[in-house]
UniProtKB/Swiss-Prot annotation:
The gene is lpxA. It comes from Salmonella arizonae (strain ATCC BAA-731 / CDC346-86 / RSK2980). Signal peptide: none annotated. It is found in: Cytoplasm. Belongs to the transferase hexapeptide repeat family. LpxA subfamily. The lineage of its organism: Bacteria, Pseudomonadati, Pseudomonadota, Gammaproteobacteria, Enterobacterales. Pathway: Glycolipid biosynthesis; lipid IV(A) biosynthesis; lipid IV(A) from (3R)-3-hydroxytetradecanoyl-[acyl-carrier-protein] and UDP-N-acetyl-alpha-D-glucosamine: step 1/6. Homotrimer. The keyword Electron transport does not apply. Its EC number is 2.3.1.129. This is Acyl-[acyl-carrier-protein]--UDP-N-acetylglucosamine O-acyltransferase. PROSITE patterns: HEXAPEP_TRANSFERASES.
Length: 262
């Protein structure tokens, strides 16, 4: 179904079965597949390809040569009906690629809302990107990566499959991330190592001074105390009982499968 207010350029191809909401704009030479749903106010600039079982929310801007919902690069993939879901108000810049999921990984690649994916960023199969994240130019997420809210991934940075990047993390450019990055941490290098707490980012997002001090204390327990990882986790859990901001660390430890960067 195509809303009567949607615009489709004469050179674009929108296949039968696609759903376009109100005021959707499909620019020149775009291709929209038959199982695609695009929400109200979303704009495809030009030469954008949206394929597969892909659902895109409202008021997104998708720039030229982006490819969304295409077959993933997992050699085990055999054409199963897997999906891509994208939220609202994202800016997806030129040549970004977002691949559909795999059955083995849950069948869904998901991008939240209010994100900026810069030129040539790649989101592989079964990744989850939260809200208000930034993937800078040429940032690359391997399969099954999870990026939590407000994280920033620097340009030319590659993230290993199954890694978790915690909320409010900043990963510097040209880095290689092979383990999980705890929330609030600045990481840099190949392999990425911790360089402190993202204090400026936390201030900009309204964290209190007391909360930031508690986060820094948790960071010190994890990285500066000389304690074993298990002992540091126990003390951080005690700290989290008094400071809710620190609970993000304990939740991260429960999810982590590759272990925190060291």
């Amino acid at each position: 179904m195509i809303d009567k207010s949607a615009f489709i350029h004469p050179t674009a191809i929108v296949e039968d079965g696609a759903v376009l909401g109100a005021n959707v704009h499909i620019g020149p030479f775009c291709i929209v597949g038959p199982q695609v749903e695009i929400g109200e106010g979303t704009v495809l600039k030009s030469h954008v390809v949206v394929n597969g079982q892909t659902k895109i929310g409202r008021d997104n801007e998708i720039y030229q040569f982006a490819s969304i919902g295409e077959v993933n690069q997992d050699l085990k993939y055999a054409g199963e009906p897997t999906r891509v879901e994208i939220g609202d108000r994202n800016r997806i810049r030129e040549s970004v690629t977002i691949h559909r999921g795999t059955v083995q990984g849950g069948g869904l690649t998901k991008v939240g809302s209010d994100n900026l994916l810069m030129i040539n960023a790649h989101v592989a199969h079964d990744c989850t990107v939260g809200n208000r994240c930034i993937l800078a130019n040429n940032a690359t997420l391997a399969g099954h990566v999870s990026i939590d809210d407000f994280a920033i991934i620097g340009g030319m940075t590659a993230v290993h499959q199954f890694c978790i990047i915690g909320a409010h993390v900043m990963v510097g450019g040209c880095s290689g991330v092979a383990q999980d990055v705890p929330p609030y941490v600045i990481a840099q290098g190949n392999h990425a190592t911790p360089f402190g707490v993202n204090i400026e980012g936390l201030k900009r997002r309204g964290f209190s001074r007391e909360g930031i001090v508690a986060i820094r204390n948790a960071y010190k327990l994890l990285y500066r105390s000389g304690k074993t990882l298990d002992d540091a986790k126990l003390e951080i859990a005690e700290l989290a009982e008094k400071h809710p901001e620190v609970k993000a660390f304990t939740e991260f430890f429960e999810r982590s499968t590759r272990g925190p960067i060291r």
